[in-house]
Amino acid sequence: MLFMVEINQTFLYMIDNTSFTVFFSWQSDVPENSDFLRSFIKASIKKLETAQNVNILYDEASRSVVGSQKVEEVILEKIRACDVFIADITPITRIETEEGEKKRIKLLPNPNVAFELGYAMHCLPMEQVLIVLPTGITHGQLPFDFNHNRLIEFDEQTNPMDEEIEKSLAFCMITRTSLVDVIVENPEDKILRP
């Protein structure tokens, strides 16, 4: 449903509960993993569009950008504007340290993905942020800040994206509907319906 909001005779914004954007933050260091995820995400989007009767735009990096804009600014704007943010934190390198006789291994994701994930965690509700990685990685091997989030595992045969994207989109729909309800119940403001 599309709602147009007008306050004091000034058009402010539209609230559209049928169009959504899924942004994929991927790494190119282990391309087969990103390729699996990309295909999983796109397949999930097609299923959800049909099942939920919504439009879902798949987006990533500086895709569909015109001209010579600064890539990092474009990506940050896309992250702020997306409805679901998916970060592929597939480890691309490892650090080994020794503490006495004990060896510790830390697996590190792509720094660009880590930066984009941190920005998304700042801008978006965590219900709209999905952190994915290959199966078989223990939480203790990841950087500290990743260990305290729900991580979604995948492999070549397992596509967790259908359910995860659907849950995040349901959260977006509820949030948008609640926003419209607040605006409608405010007697000083006027809401226009299509």
Residue ranges and their predicted role:
Residues 50, 119-127:
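Arginine/glycine-rich "motif VI" loop of SF2 helicases in the C-terminal RecA-like domain
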Residues 5-84:
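Conserved N-terminal substructure of TIR/SEFIR domains
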Residues 29-30, 93, 136-139:
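Conserved nucleotide-binding/hydrolysis micro-motifs of P-loop NTPases
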